[in-house]
A protein has these predicted regions:
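Mid-domain alpha/beta scaffold segments of enzyme catalytic cores
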Residues: 1-256
Length: 256
């Protein structure tokens, strides 16, 4: 059985067949999934989704949205984090891909700090989004007065950066790009980082595995990620499923 630790099933791309997608997911061998609700417009839609068995949530304010967020949004977020089926805070982090001006970076760091503090207050792990900002993220985390626990979602950094995050206590999220032909750096990371520090994620509807590339991704496709990791690490599918499943349970303690 596999746990998809990062899905966005409230996305509008699933509006026409969400029920079928969820049914396919659990029929394909998925045991649980985490709905990552990091866009404020989807928060309450996610609350409805997690009423279903074996679907849990993470709530946060995505770095791309921090300039739109106001004080009341953080107050709403704090309430959502206390939901019994909320197992993490996120995805939160730094994203310099679209806008790396100082004002935006400062706002992202301020928001990240607020949300890290909320995670600490309610003893939740964090799901970290990091794009074109790995060195800054490492520096930021090291400066915190406490060390958060969590996962670096959809890791795409170097092996050196991967080792630093693992040394800091983080897991690395491995997604569809591990199956792509031009993913040598990521394959090297997976080869050299112990399986006990890896999580499998789809990030659906984004980043479909090579077999389904250029189509909408969905949780049932997660087996393609597991297969690729097994091939890289010369391990059986069962071993990869068993260890990554336990990794998810160890990190997201609210999953039952």
């Amino acid at each position: 059985m596999i746990i998809d630790t990062h899905a966005h099933l409230t996305d509008i791309k699933f509006d026409n067949d969400r029920k079928d997608v969820i049914e396919r997911a659990f029929n394909s061998g998925l045991s649980r999934l985490i709905e990552v609700s990091c866009e404020m417009c989807y928060w309450y839609k996610s609350l409805e989704l997690i009423k279903q068995n074996n679907i849990f949530a993470s709530f946060g304010i995505h770095p791309i949205d921090v300039l739109k967020a106001v004080k009341s949004d953080y107050e709403k977020l704090e309430t959502l984090i206390q939901n019994e089926k909320c197992v993490a805070v996120g995805e939160i982090g730094l994203d310099y891909h679209y806008d790396n001006c100082k004002n935006n970076i400062d706002a992202q760091k301020e928001s990240l700090k607020v949300q890290l503090d909320l995670a600490k207050k309610y003893s939740k792990p964090v799901i970290i989004h990091c794009r074109d900002a790995y060195d800054d993220m490492i520096e930021f985390i090291k400066k915190q007065s406490f060390m958060p626990t969590g996962v670096i979602h959809c890791f795409s950094g170097s092996l050196e950066q991967a080792k630093i995050f693992v040394d800091l206590g983080f897991y690395l999220g491995i997604d569809g790009p591990i199956t792509y032909k031009k993913s040598d750096i990521l394959k090297e990371v997976v080869k050299n980082i112990e399986i006990g520090k890896l999580l499998v994620e789809t990030d659906c509807p984004y980043l479909a595995p090579q077999k389904y590339k250029r189509t909408r991704n969905e949780p049932s496709y997660i087996i393609e990620i597991v297969k690729e990791i097994a091939s890289i690490k010369n391990m059986s599918l069962n071993e990869i499923e068993k260890v990554t499943n336990q990794n998810a349970l160890n990190l997201f303690k609210g999953i039952k």
